UniProtKB/Swiss-Prot annotation:
InterPro entries: ATP_synth_F1_dsu/esu (IPR001469), ATP_synth_F1_dsu/esu_N (IPR020546), ATP_synth_F1_esu_C (IPR020547), ATPsynth_dsu/esu_N (IPR036771). The gene is atpE. CDD domains: F1-ATPase_delta. This is ATP synthase epsilon chain, chloroplastic. GO terms for biological process: proton motive force-driven ATP synthesis. It is a peripheral membrane protein. Keywords: ATP synthesis, CF(1), Chloroplast, Hydrogen ion transport, Ion transport, Membrane, Plastid, Thylakoid, Transport. It comes from Spinacia oleracea. NCBIfam families: ATP_synt_epsi.
Length: 134
């Protein structure tokens, strides 16, 4: 049995096909979703979406949004997303280093919040690019 997974950003569809299982980063922690999962609606955190296709795991970097799960269908609406395989690890690492420097230099509450969000996005991209599918 499978799940139909659809991951959408405001500009494009990132994923739309059947999967065996997912592990989703939510605002209250990670949840695993298998076929016949209880209906759920949840906020999606900045983090990794792990997708299992048979014996292979793929990753997507998600930049926050919402997910609806029910009737073996998962719809995830996010601000932005990238497939881990599309992310250049060196570029992602450079972006992380810049984000860390910007957080150290941040002054004022707003700058610190924005720098912290940029750092979380950069860490997520690095993690997604470094994940090896098995």
């Amino acid at each position: 049995m499978t799940l139909n997974l659809c991951v959408l950003t405001p500009n494009r569809s990132i994923w739309n096909s059947e999967v065996k299982e997912i592990i989703l980063s939510t605002n209250s922690g990670q949840i695993g979703v298998l076929p016949n999962h209880a209906p759920t609606a949840t906020a999606v955190d900045i983090g990794i979406l792990r997708i299992r296709l048979n014996d292979q795991w793929l990753t997507l970097a998600l930049m926050g949004g919402f997910a609806r799960i029910g009737n073996n269908e998962i719809t995830i609406l996010v601000n932005d997303a990238e497939r881990g395989s599309d992310i250049d690890p060196q570029e992602a690492q450079q972006t992380l280093e810049i984000a860390e420097a910007n957080l150290r230099k941040a002054e004022g509450k707003r700058q610190k919040i924005e720098a912290n969000l940029a750092l979380r996005r950069a860490r997520t991209r690095v993690e997604a690019s470094n994940t090896i599918s098995s």
